[in-house]
């Protein structure tokens, strides 16, 4: 796909998709546009982004998209579904209605989210059915610990193989305030959004390669290449005027009935994970192996492009930004092209024994 020497070809390729609610439209638009570019270059090939990566990891909406890609869906298919269904997941409501509802219940019903996920990954598909390695973070509310849903790419992995993907997808996207915790019957546990612990899963993706993929890949840091796609939300912070109001620092005003608290938590740990990744790569002289694609939304637009704004204007803006960034980067950035030299080898392990 590119006149690049074999030396430049990545040995292990990781796709990492950040969380961000409705802003995931930006993420999937980037991936879908790259597919279109590759399809134009290779009209006789069935181009699917997921086929080019040895590990796909994602959080929240990024986790849903990661699972969709791992099932063999194209990014273009997922883009179409999300654009059509996002308005059902995040229906427009007056802010006063949201405010009142958040006092005693989640703002949004999880049913449209489940229906959308079923369209993307199927209702019965399990981790054992996948031929692409995946890792999806979530928070196990029943134990108070993070949990990572995975394909059985480590021979000792047995817990998640028979687990349905829809449970992992609903678990990683159950953002507090917005959606109710997801109960996974097979694990007998309640889950909340993975963005509370790893909104950018790139660093844990790198560690996964060295720890639980080592039976397939005996590699060093310089052999692992990470493509990380953001959701235009990395620079969020509370306004100085809001923070300076000493009498209005409670849950309702300062934290916006939980919305600002969730966003602050996700943004802070996103920075933390990215910085840990960069320090780790720098230590091993492998900084050039990491490519981060994202944008910072201008101030006026930022107030409109939020986690739960799925209006036509917001989705169209996010889609346009994603497509533009994909075209510019693919034309100018050889590092991006190197991820798509050739498909990765499919993964399949069937000799897993039952072990908790």
Curated annotation (Swiss-Prot):
Pfam families: Patatin. Disulfide bonds: none annotated. One of its GO terms (biological process) is lipid catabolic process. Keywords: Antiviral defense, Hydrolase, Lipid degradation, Lipid metabolism. A motif (GXSXG) lies at residues 58-62. The keyword Hydrolase applies. Induction: Part of a CBASS operon consisting of capV-dncV-cap2-cap3. A motif (GXGXXG) lies at residues 19-24. It catalyses: a 1,2-diacyl-sn-glycero-3-phosphocholine + H2O = a 2-acyl-sn-glycero-3-phosphocholine + a fatty acid + H(+); 1,2-di-(9Z-octadecenoyl)-sn-glycero-3-phosphoethanolamine + 2 H2O = sn-glycero-3-phosphoethanolamine + 2 (9Z)-octadecenoate + 2 H(+). It is an enzyme of class 3 (hydrolase). InterPro entries: Acyl_Trfase/lysoPLipase, PNPLA_dom. Transmembrane segments: none annotated. GO terms for molecular function: phospholipase A1 activity. A motif (DGA/G) lies at residues 193-195. It comes from the Bacteria. Its EC number is 3.1.1.32. Phospholipase activity is specifically activated upon 3',3'-cGAMP binding, which is produced by the cognate cyclic nucleotide synthase encoded in the same operon. The active site is at residues 60, 193. Residues 15-206 form the PNPLA domain. Belongs to the patatin family. Effector phospholipase of a CBASS antiviral system. CBASS (cyclic oligonucleotide-based antiphage signaling system) provides immunity against bacteriophages. The CD-NTase protein (DncV) synthesizes cyclic nucleotides in response to infection; these serve as specific second messenger signals. The signals activate a diverse range of effectors, leading to bacterial cell death and thus abortive phage infection. A type II-A(GA) CBASS system. NCBIfam families: CBASS_lipase (NF041079). This is cGAMP-activated phospholipase.
